[in-house]
Amino acid sequence: MRLDQVARSLLLKEFVSGFALAMRYLFKPKATINYPFEMGHRSPRFRGEHALRRYPNGEERCIACKLCEAVCPAQAITIEAGPRRNDGTRRTTRYDIDMVKCIYCGMCQEACPVDAIVEGPNFEFSVETREELLYDKQRLLANGDRWEREIARNIAADAPYR
């Protein structure tokens, strides 16, 4: 053994430097959070569970233009449009999203001209069966009603960058 190796092993240099490093981090604030009880910060651009939004008067926003269906790379969206109304507008009779196929790319949200389909802030939507991940229009509208306040706040925060 060389002399420097003997000195290091006798003086326990590695042990002391490791202990000093541990003591340094002991007094710093913790970097981890206790997840189920504490929630970390999410960006306004976070892409979570899908939702269909309504106008303040309660009418659904979707105008059945089918741009989201056309732009979806996973082909997870299926839309059927109803007949035109007396005022010339259309609404959907069927709006389905297969969340198993969805890759959460956000292209449907980008393509929508009236901000009807959005990816909301909810990421805790575990299910027991695969069929529960087939979202129909009623479930999407219920998600929109439940998360509307936070969705509107996120869209407003992101508006300068769109």
Swiss-Prot record:
Protein location: Cell inner membrane
Enzyme Commission number(s): 7.1.1.-
Membrane topology term: Peripheral membrane protein
Substrates-to-products reaction catalysed: a quinone + NADH + 5 H(+)(in) = a quinol + NAD(+) + 4 H(+)(out)
InterPro entries with a match to the protein in the record: 4Fe4S_Fe-S-bd, 4Fe4S_Fe_S_CS, NADH_quinone_OxRdtase_chainI
Main subcellular location: membrane
Binding site for [4Fe-4S] cluster 2: 72, 102, 105, 108
Domain 4Fe-4S ferredoxin-type: 52-82, 93-122
Needed co-factor(s): [4Fe-4S] cluster
UniProt key word Repeat: yes
Record's keyword terms, sorted: 4Fe-4S, Cell inner membrane, Cell membrane, Iron, Iron-sulfur, Membrane, Metal-binding, NAD, Quinone, Repeat, Translocase, Ubiquinone
One Pfam family of this chain: Fer4_7
Superkingdom classification of source: Bacteria
SUPFAM superfamilies, sorted: 4Fe-4S ferredoxins (SSF54862)
Family listed: Belongs to the complex I 23 kDa subunit family.
Annotated function: NDH-1 shuttles electrons from NADH, via FMN and iron-sulfur (Fe-S) centers, to quinones in the respiratory chain. The immediate electron acceptor for the enzyme in this species is believed to be ubiquinone. Couples the redox reaction to proton translocation (for every two electrons transferred, four hydrogen ions are translocated across the cytoplasmic membrane), and thus conserves the redox energy in a proton gradient.
Quaternary structure and interacting proteins, as annotated: NDH-1 is composed of 14 different subunits. Subunits NuoA, H, J, K, L, M, N constitute the membrane sector of the complex.
Protein name: NADH-quinone oxidoreductase subunit I
Species this protein is from: Methylobacterium sp. (strain 4-46)
